[in-house]
Regions:
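Short, structured secondary-structure boundary patches
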Residues: 71-77, 140-144, 256-259
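Short amphipathic alpha-helical surface patches that mediate protein-protein
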Residues: 59-62, 126-129, 243-244
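Acidic/His-rich structured neighborhood in mature extracellular/periplasmic domains
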Residues: 78-222
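Helix N-cap/coil-helix junction residues
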Residues: 48-49, 116, 202, 232
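An acidic, Gly/Ser/Thr/Pro-rich helix-cap/linker signature
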Residues: 2-111
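Non-transmembrane alpha-helical segments in soluble domains
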Residues: 40, 166, 224-227
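Flexible, glycine-rich surface segments
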Residues: 176-294
Length: 295
């Protein structure tokens, strides 16, 4: 299959000892740490926060060493038939049908405005959190701070996300510790990271809040806006079946399945038979769906 949308990043695991270098700090007061003090100073210098305000925040953070253990679990790559069995179950399909029927007016209105199909919006919410039934129960201040300062491998990324989280709490005029999400800091039904929330979340009903936890209009519009701003083309094919003979070069492209660095024309020149209605200029990636063991 040539697929014209990118997939979510899969982060490979690293040896446990790399993440435990800073585990010694868990349990100590965050405000005694030089890196936390440096973060506070930099955040204050950029404006919008006072040092006392941030010291109160870090003084109330509960570090979560179990999050480090979760992040250290070896990553797995599952074939499509296993993913489908686990994530597209009969019960989830029923939940999706109910979610869509209960909210059809607002979802279809969002779809019309953004040009993103209603079924795609519904499917994304279902895969991410099973329609809000699994949004995570960690206080985001706790999870993001733990990862920002006790997970060296991705400290830079999570410090940026922590900074984004602090800003969005101000923007939403909410207590920083009322936000709940996943162990990795993802939020709401669509599981947006704080930076994605600030950039792509939408206040659909104009109530002054971008509530991606409870407000289906905000959820649907945020998903649709994210897709549109990332290049969704209304009416364009998302995936098409192709025929090919595997060569070492094509196998390398299959292995790099999340890299959207080639066009349909590139694949045609490598011998991939793509349906004629797909233009050569379209960016695409080659993806193999294993529908059964060995098939």
């Amino acid at each position: 299959t040539v697929q014209t949308e990118t997939a979510a990043e899969t982060v490979p695991p690293v040896p446990t000892h790399q993440t435990h270098l800073d585990a010694q700090y868990i349990g100590q007061g965050l405000l005694t740490r030089p890196d936390v003090q440096r973060f506070i100073s930099q955040r204050v210098a950029r404006g919008g926060f006072s040092r006392p305000e941030l010291e109160v925040f870090f003084g109330n953070v509960e570090q979560k060493p179990n999050i480090i253990s979760i992040m250290d679990r070896p990553g797995t790559s599952r074939p499509w038939y296993e993913f489908r069995q686990n994530n597209v179950s009969g019960s989830r399909i029923q939940n999706g049908d109910r979610f869509w029927r209960n909210n059809v007016a607002v979802i279809d209105a969002v779809s019309q405005r953004y040009g993103v199909p209603s079924e795609l919006i519904v499917a994304i919410v279902g895969i991410e959190t099973n329609y809000g039934s699994n949004m995570g129960s960690f206080r985001l201040g706790d999870s993001l701070t733990t990862l920002a300062f006790s997970y060296p491998r991705r400290a830079e990324f999570f410090q940026k996300e922590l900074d984004q989280f602090l800003q969005l709490a101000h923007e939403e005029k909410q207590d920083m510790f009322t936000f709940k999400g996943s162990y990795a800091g993802a939020m709401g039904m669509p599981q947006f990271m704080p930076s994605s929330y600030r950039q792509w979340a939408v206040d659909w009903d104009g109530d002054g809040h971008r509530d991606i936890w409870n407000n289906v209009g905000d959820v649907a519009a945020s998903v649709a806006n994210y897709m549109k701003q990332h290049g969704w083309q209304t009416g364009a094919p998302m995936a098409v079946p192709v025929q090919l003979n595997i060569t070492p070069e094509l196998q390398a492209l299959l292995d790099a399945k999340t890299e959207l660095n080639h066009t349909v024309g590139d694949f045609r020149r490598l011998g991939v038979q793509v349906p004629g209605h797909v233009a050569d200029r379209e960016k695409a990636l080659l993806y193999q769906l294993e529908i059964a063991p060995g098939q």
